[in-house]
Curated annotation (Swiss-Prot):
It comes from the Bacteria. This is UPF0250 protein COSY_0496. InterPro entries: UPF0250_YbeD-like, YbeD-like_sf. It holds the Pfam family DUF493. It comes from Vesicomyosocius okutanii subsp. Calyptogena okutanii (strain HA). The lineage of its organism: Bacteria, Pseudomonadati, Pseudomonadota, Gammaproteobacteria, Candidatus Pseudothioglobaceae.
């Protein structure tokens, strides 16, 4: 019988390249705030690894930030801190 271990540690080979997508209202502080949160858990972010897209009406914005992830704990911590930020609407 084959058992499948579904833990995320087995789904990723850390360290690995990982993309975080963050959505929120389009405001002045949004980019600096989310970059500061992500940098708490990683090294300085590379501006070339950050992409920004506006919604069709410009009310919302999404950022994709590529990082080198070192562990599932690190990813969970980043995700939780972003979710706790009142400027962030959604994190993928």
């Amino acid at each position: 019988m084959i058992t499948v271990n579904s833990t995320s540690e087995t789904l990723f080979n850390f360290p690995c390249d990982y993309s975080i997508k963050i959505f929120g209202k389009n405001c002045e502080k949004f980019q600096n705030t989310i970059c500061t949160i992500v940098e708490r858990h990683t090294h300085k972010l590379n501006p070339n690894k950050i992409t920004k897209k506006h919604s069709s009406k410009g009310n919302y914005v999404s950022f994709s930030i590529r990082i080198i992830a070192n562990s599932r704990i690190q990813l969970d911590s980043i995700n939780q801190d972003l979710k706790n930020c009142n400027l962030v609407s959604y994190v993928l």
